[in-house]
Amino acid sequence: MKTYSAKPADIEKKWVVIDATGLVVGRLATVIAMRLRGKHRATFTPHVDTGDNVVVINAEKVVLTGRKRDQKVYYHHTGFPGGIKERTAKFILDGRFPERVIEKAVERMLARGPLGRKVLGNLRVYKGPTHPHEAQQPTVLDVAALNSKNVRI
């Protein structure tokens, strides 16, 4: 029997919505990355985008364990000499775009190639409880119920 290889035309992409309220960032990001990549399916094929479209709501209510909220530092460089900049997770979560913490965590769990960039385009993160994807009829994925360690209250 030959190994099954999924073709792009055979894949049915589902829409999944995840409520990030009280969820631990790293544990949430692993579930999202697995869903985006399609590794939860029996028809997973390494060179094809077999994953789902994932919508994350309430990104501002996500939790970092330990003292990471104060101690975790995100770096970026301006491109100029000595232009290294840093921001703490607390600064980002309390700022205008708290969804970037989840986006960055998932981005760093995916491959850094053409397929990884394509798969990351299937992720939509919103800081509030509403999202504009109701027409796609997304199914709710309860990440808190998967493992008791996924949620902190």
Curated annotation (Swiss-Prot):
Keyword Ribosomal protein: yes
The entry's keywords: Ribonucleoprotein, Ribosomal protein
GO terms, biological process: negative regulation of translation; translation
InterPro entries reported in the protein's UniProt record: Ribosomal_uL13, Ribosomal_uL13_bac-type, Ribosomal_uL13_sf
Keyword hit for Nucleotide-binding: no
Gene Ontology CC annotations of this record: cytosolic large ribosomal subunit
Single annotated GO MF: structural constituent of ribosome
Quaternary structure note: Part of the 50S ribosomal subunit.
Role noted for this protein: This protein is one of the early assembly proteins of the 50S ribosomal subunit, although it is not seen to bind rRNA by itself. It is important during the early stages of 50S assembly.
Entry-linked PANTHER family: LARGE RIBOSOMAL SUBUNIT PROTEIN UL13M (PTHR11545:SF2), RIBOSOMAL PROTEIN L13 (PTHR11545)
Recorded family membership: Belongs to the universal ribosomal protein uL13 family.
Protein known as: Large ribosomal subunit protein uL13
Name of the gene encoding the protein in the UniProt record: rplM
